């Protein structure tokens, strides 16, 4: 992997991980479009770590408060502060974790083609637009319950299929449940933390137990660029959220689906 490829893919991962446009679709399609070889599991690990550090740093106060109150709630056997939210994040992670263990090989082998990504990019983009268009979205973080966590968690599991977009489908589910844009987005981003930790652990195990030779230059470039781009993307996404809504991302997904159909199908 040359420096340009590592830089480009790191920036791309950081930009697309938290925007509702699917990072996996972009990381699959871009090498195919440019004729690049697969970036390798070591690079995948680096960009996962970069985006994980970005979301943890950006939401550091939330993360600290949720972790603290979750541990206190466990010790006292009653909900304290944000202890309930800690449990909702655990509940919301379980469906994707189980689906990943059961279906990841099948998804990697059979659901990474252009036709699948075209379908998921288009259909889930339209669903995001419909969810954003619906009125009466007034629910805040304080109103969340375990049923919301289960539904959003199931939606997150669907994002194992490339093109769906983890942030996109979880925000869509939140909006359909009546959450405000900010609530749906913040819950989605917080829910990303445990799932990225799990994904990073899987990649780390794969690196540690195989004969993979890690390109450390690419690893460093990918990790740093994905971190910087991800924290920037989160900031501006939330800053502009109520001004522009989800429609720029919906339109982009429709255009991207058209490009996939025209060029790769």
From Swiss-Prot:
Main location: membrane
Bilayer-crossing regions: 1-21, 39-59, 84-104, 114-134, 144-164, 187-207, 218-238, 244-264
Subcellular localization(s) per the UniProt record: Cell inner membrane
GO annotation, biological process: cell wall organization; peptidoglycan biosynthetic process; regulation of cell shape; response to antibiotic
Main EC class the enzyme belongs to: hydrolase
Keyword Secreted attributed: no
Signal peptide location: none
Keywords assigned by UniProt, alphabetized: Antibiotic resistance, Cell inner membrane, Cell membrane, Cell shape, Cell wall biogenesis/degradation, Hydrolase, Membrane, Peptidoglycan synthesis, Transmembrane, Transmembrane helix
Molecular function per GO: undecaprenyl-diphosphatase activity
Membrane topology reported for the UniProt record: Multi-pass membrane protein
EC number: 3.6.1.27
Record's catalysed reaction(s): di-trans,octa-cis-undecaprenyl diphosphate + H2O = di-trans,octa-cis-undecaprenyl phosphate + phosphate + H(+)
CC annotations in GO: plasma membrane
Function per UniProt: Catalyzes the dephosphorylation of undecaprenyl diphosphate (UPP). Confers resistance to bacitracin.
Matching NCBIfam families: PRK00281.2-4, undec_PP_bacA
Misc. comment: Bacitracin is thought to be involved in the inhibition of peptidoglycan synthesis by sequestering undecaprenyl diphosphate, thereby reducing the pool of lipid carrier available.
UniProt family annotation: Belongs to the UppP family.
PANTHER family on file: UNDECAPRENYL-DIPHOSPHATASE
Protein name: Undecaprenyl-diphosphatase
